C-alpha cells in the first residue's frame, strides 16, 4: 500500500486523558466497543442515504449499505468495514484526533477514582470510536469519502497513546475500514460465535445489516452472513418488541450505559401520520446545563434519516427527552430552517410534548419512588415549564414537587395536589416562601404565624423558583401567595381584627410614627404586625413590588434591578420592641431601631450593606 503525505500528529490533550480513563474504567464492560463501532457505521450509512437524496451519484453504483466483520486469528486482528459516507483527511483529523465537544475539559476534571461511577460518566459522554482501544493496542483506519476519487483515501493509525499517523492512500471503495490489533488476552473477539452473541445483544434493532465473514474450509470461498434483524425497531409492532430490545435501542441512540427510566412507542394515523419512540433517561446528561448542550430527537422522514438533535420537536424544558420521530408529512429535503416555520412541525411538537407529559403523569401516579428518581435528575428543567409553555401550565404544575413545612425535610416530595388536600378549613391560598437555601426558608421568621396556626408552607430554595412562581399564579382555583409579601389574607390569619389588639396597637401609634420619621425614605412603610411569635421584626414587600429573590436573580445575571423598598413590620408583643418603644433618648432610640431593621434585613436578604456597623450596634447594646 503506497502512502503519500504521511505525518505524525499529537492527540488533543483531552483525547489522551479520555483514552486512559476508558481503558481503565470501562474494561469490565469492554464488549461495548463493538456496539459503539457498529453504531458509528450505522450513522455513516444514515448520512450517506440522506446526502444521496439530492446527490444519488454518491452511491457510486452500490446502494446496498451494510457493515461487515471479519477476523484473522493468526494476525490477531478484528476488522469492521462499512460502505457509508466515509471521511476526508480533514474529517479524519477532526473526528479521530480531537473531541469537538464543549465542556469536555470540565467533564474530564469531574472524573474521580470511583470506577463504577466513572464508567457511567464516560459512557454518558459517548466514547464512540475511542472505545476500540479498550481491547486493541493499535487501531488502523482506512477510509474514503463518498464521491471522492480513489486516490483521496486516508490512512490513520495509532497505539492510543500520545500521537497518531495519517497519510493519503488509494482506496477503491468508499466508506471506512477499522482494523483492531487486539491486546493479549482478548482472543474471545476472534471467535465467530462470540461476535454473533455481542452483535445480537447490541445491534439487532438497527436498520443497517451487520454481516460476518464465513469461510468454507474446503475450498476457501468467502460468504457474508447477515446476523442482525436489520429492521428499524420503531417500525415493528409494539407487541413483538421486548423490553430488552427497547433498552438496547435507547443505549444505541443515546450512547448511554444505563437503562432508560421509561419509554413510549406510538404510531399515529389520520390527519398526521408519524411514529414516535420517546425515552426518559434515568440520569441527566453530564452537560445538560451547558449552553451548547445538543438536545432534541432524531428525525426520520418516511424511514429515511434526516438529522440528529432536531430540537424543534420538543420544548426546551423537556430537553432531556431522547428518542426519534418518523414523519410521513415532512418533505425529504427538509432543513432546520424549514422545520422552524413549519405548521407540521408545530403540530408534531404539541403532540409530542403532551405525550411526554402524559408519560410523566402516569409515572407519578403509578410509581412515586421512580418519579422521585426522575425529579431529582430533571426537576430543575421541568421548573422552566410554566414560563415556557403556557398551554400546558396546569399539567406541568401537577408534576412539580416541593419541600414543605409538612415533611420537615429538604427532599422535594410534596405535590400541589398533596398540599391542596391538606389545606386548613377556610384557607383560600397556597402559601410559599423563596430563599437562598432550604435552611434559610425553613427558619424564616415569616413562617412563625403558619407554624402557630398549623398551616403548611411550601419551601422554595432553587434559584429558578422565584422566576417560576412569577408565572405560576394559581392551582386548582387557589392563588399562590408568598408569605414574604404583604397580603390581607395574612392579616386575617393573624386575627388582627380583634378589639383588644386594635386598642394595644393604637397606644403604639406614636412609636410607629417616630420610627417612620427616623427611617424616612429608606422604607416604604412602618407597621405593627401580629404575624410574629419569636421575632421582633421582619421586612415584607407589597404584592406588586419586586421580591428579594427576584432582585438577587437580576443581580446574579448582571442586570440592573430597581431597589426593593421594604415594609418594616414590628411585633408589638416582643420584649425588644417594647424596650425600644420606651427609649426616650433619640440617639439610643435610633440605635435600637437600626438594630431591629438590620436584623430583619439580614433574615430576609442574608447580607447587610454594612455588617461591621451591625456588629458594633449589637455589641454596644449587649454591654449597655
UniProtKB/Swiss-Prot annotation:
Region annotation (A) ranges: 1-336
SUPFAM superfamilies: ATPase domain of HSP90 chaperone/DNA topoisomerase II/histidine kinase (SSF55874), HSP90 C-terminal domain (SSF110942), Ribosomal protein S5 domain 2-like (SSF54211)
Spans annotated as B: 337-552
Compartmental location: Cytoplasm
A molecular function GO annotation: ATP hydrolysis activity
Keyword Cytoplasm found: yes
Predominant location category: cytoplasm
Keywords: ATP-binding, Chaperone, Cytoplasm, Nucleotide-binding, Stress response
C: annotated segments: 553-624
Keyword Chaperone: yes
One GO location term (cellular component): cytoplasm
Top-level taxon of origin: Bacteria
Self-association state and partner proteins as the record states: Homodimer.
Function per UniProt: Molecular chaperone. Has ATPase activity.
Family: Belongs to the heat shock protein 90 family.
Record protein name field: Chaperone protein HtpG
Species: Yersinia enterocolitica serotype O:8 / biotype 1B (strain NCTC 13174 / 8081)
